[in-house]
Amino acid sequence: MDSIAGPEAQWQTSRAKALCYRGPRYVTGADLVRIARTLALEPWHFTQTAPAAANDPTGVVLDNARRRVNVRVANAAHGCVFHIRTLEGTGRCGLGELAPVSCRMFPSVPGGNTEPAGEGGHRLDEEELAAAERQWIADRDHWFELVARWNTLAEKAETPPDVQDFQRYLLEAQAAREAGTPWPEDVVA
């Protein structure tokens, strides 16, 4: 049954209005790689770019430094491409626990309970929220470094790299991170 009554309905509604209809904003490379691996899809099949500010640490340099973009989960007419709309007009995240960490954290409230928030998830309690925040911070810091390293490489490239080249680098760099090995460019340098 899709209907949820009481506080859980309010929680799901606020989550959908804030994130699902607009698409997740604070997605890291680790999130994109985890989704890509699980769905057996290259990241460019479910991501899109948006203009990035000059000082944005997630701004990926493309086209011989003529463009800076953010790479994010794509939006469809109804919001995030993974947002599944029900016949009643409500929605659910089609990724469940695979969703980006920032999506799983929002809108968790310190002191919340772990009762189910509907199919496929639950509200995070304080300990789970703290663990998710630590994971997100580590992923975010790695994402910032990954983008900075890519931007340095892109400036030196003989042919202008595109967003798919960046995402290939992302897949390699995340694999290196998980294996505890050096960055891809440090191995071949």
What positions do the PLM features span?
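Short loop/turn segments that flank or connect secondary-structure elements
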Residues: M1-A189
